[in-house]
């Protein structure tokens, strides 16, 4: 009888879990719809802006040479909340393959800090901003980019790279990275695969334009990466909660079958005892 009560208690607990995971799934779904709309609105502009900047970069008379053993400031766009599947883990794994001694990390979101902050003297963290969903705007990203550039200059680093999550579809998202400063010629060639037939004239010259647009490019790249990463985070959390709800339902059915069998055996035993007493 005590075991039956224990199974019943577990069933009640699982029912509560199902309600919680379903509620979190609905919240994640609402955020996903909002961020997807925001992503669609800005993605076209970002792509066209990258192409326009690429035309200037690829028109340089003297292409910048790749840096040898550069010291990098990695901007990690992790989440501030958990229960989002492999979203944060995948970015950590990607950075592990790229991180070199002397590199530094600026965190946007708090979840991945503990993985990299080992408490020793070689702590790579140089900054942290906890960006909430309601803070995600271009103006706010401009303020954050100023903080990042301060750390970049303070630690005398060579380049800035962003670690973010690239959106494929609601079920598939990939951790990715790209260099935002100095300009990566290979990235702009990917955005401008067709060779320009007519050479463009720039006023002022290309070098001056690049110096002027570099801060704006960083602001836009930061905002675009955050919007896409937030979209991926909400999709990943929605999938995680959906899987958790399904697993909880399966567990509830298992407990329900077990409960019914035990209850049936208990009733059968009581009937046998009653019949035995009458006879």
Curated annotation (Swiss-Prot):
Any transmembrane segments, and where?
none
Q: What membrane topology was assigned to this protein in its record?
A: Peripheral membrane protein
What's the main place this protein lives? Answer: membrane
Top-level lineage group: Bacteria
MF annotations from Gene Ontology: ATP binding; proton-transporting ATP synthase activity, rotational mechanism
GO BP annotations of the record are:
proton motive force-driven plasma membrane ATP synthesis
The record, for InterPro entries, names: ATP_synth_F1_ATPase_gsu, ATP_synth_F1_gsu
Q: How does it assemble?
A: F-type ATPases have 2 components, CF(1) - the catalytic core - and CF(0) - the membrane proton channel. CF(1) has five subunits: alpha(3), beta(3), gamma(1), delta(1), epsilon(1). CF(0) has three main subunits: a, b and c.
Q: What is this protein called?
A: ATP synthase gamma chain
Which species is this record about? Mycoplasma pneumoniae (strain ATCC 29342 / M129 / Subtype 1)
**Mind giving the lineage of the organism this protein is from?**
Bacteria, Bacillati, Mycoplasmatota, Mycoplasmoidales, Mycoplasmoidaceae
